């Protein structure tokens, strides 16, 4: 746990009060902390899953990827929230948040509930100041509570990324319920794409003798697919907690870039070597002569920017180029993956 300035100052006051005759105990700390990492904010409070496993405490967790405020208002930024809680009572054990905006006030809300031994049901009742520039009608903390309540009450049966990764392919049926355009940008190996809007008409394509793992981008459509399937007699269904975004982030290889001291500034990059070695490559069109199509994708959340880029690219004429502006932090990675 992180005993930082806040607990230290409380301890100082308690010491002074007790010196003067008061009998005030120190109630302990739940280790709430926050840090700035370049333009991102990382925060934690309470007990994470790793500590709960070490203590032998049975728990569940939920992961969501909401926006910092209403998505239709400019400059909404993504954040990821994970909470841990008791399987039976719903008591909130801990929470971790990573994002760009609004992380501080959300971690404070979680810390307050944990400090007062509250539950995920208390998160559902959170009442905060709301206007589109500051939050959404359902605050991210409340959404975390709703998802946790769905798990406790059996409205969904989650599968976590570690479990899904370790299950042999022949023992699972991966159902990607995103749109065809999203699926074309990449999915889990072996996944079958049936968009959510088509699911009711294509249930005959699904096996009833194998476990079906539904997933989407962040979890919501996967949950809806889970509900549809279970209400139509499928009893072997689980939904990927946090969706494809969580799975990809957790399983992505860590790349360490190192400077090559022997390489001079004049040495061509690998990309330059590849391009120059292509004998059949068409002659490059001068940048000044190429028509530039400018696309504004600011404010859109994943997969909005990449789908907008794809739609623009599909309509390009020969020699035209695209210049796209986006605020979604994951867009450069998504664009590189799509181009490859």
Regions found by a protein language model. Give the residues of each.
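Hydrophobic alpha-helical packing residues
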Residues: 52, 229-230, 340
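Domain-level signature for proteins that mediate thiol-based redox and metal-cofactor handling
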Residues: 275-340
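Short, surface-exposed connector motifs at secondary-structure boundaries
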Residues: 91, 207-211, 315-322
């Amino acid at each position: 746990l992180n005993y930082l300035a806040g607990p230290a100052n409380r301890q100082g006051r308690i010491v002074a009060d007790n010196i003067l005759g008061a009998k005030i105990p120190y109630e302990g700390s739940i280790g709430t902390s926050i840090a700035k990492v370049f333009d991102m904010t990382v925060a934690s409070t309470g007990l994470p899953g790793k500590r709960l496993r070490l203590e032998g405490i049975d728990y569940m967790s939920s992961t969501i990827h909401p926006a910092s405020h209403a998505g239709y208002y400019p400059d909404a930024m993504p954040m990821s929230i994970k909470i841990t809680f008791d399987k039976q009572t719903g008591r909130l054990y801990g929470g971790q948040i990573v994002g760009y905006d609004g992380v501080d006030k959300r971690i404070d809300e979680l810390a307050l509930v944990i400090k007062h031994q509250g539950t995920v049901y208390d998160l559902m009742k959170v009442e905060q100041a709301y206007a589109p520039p500051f939050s959404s009608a359902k605050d991210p903390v409340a959404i975390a509570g709703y998802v946790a309540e769905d798990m406790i009450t059996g409205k969904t049966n989650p599968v976590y990324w570690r479990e899904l990764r370790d299950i042999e392919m022949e023992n699972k049926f991966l159902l990607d319920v995103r749109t065809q355009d999203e699926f074309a940008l990449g999915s889990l190996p072996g996944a079958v794409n049936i968009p959510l809007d088509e699911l009711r008409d294509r249930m005959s394509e699904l096996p009833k003798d194998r476990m079906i793992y539904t997933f989407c981008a962040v979890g919501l459509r996967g949950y809806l697919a889970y509900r549809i399937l279970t209400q139509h007699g499928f009893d072997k269904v689980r939904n990927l907690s946090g969706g494809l975004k969580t799975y990809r982030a957790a399983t992505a290889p860590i790349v360490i870039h190192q400077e090559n001291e022997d390489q001079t500034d004049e040495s061509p990059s690998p990309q330059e070597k590849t391009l120059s070695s292509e004998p059949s490559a068409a002659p490059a069109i001068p940048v000044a002569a190429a028509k530039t199509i400018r696309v504004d994708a600011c404010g859109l959340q994943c997969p909005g920017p990449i789908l907008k880029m794809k739609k623009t690219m599909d309509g390009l004429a020969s020699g035209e180029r695209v210049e796209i502006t986006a605020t979604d932090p994951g867009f450069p990675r998504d664009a590189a993956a799509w181009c490859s």
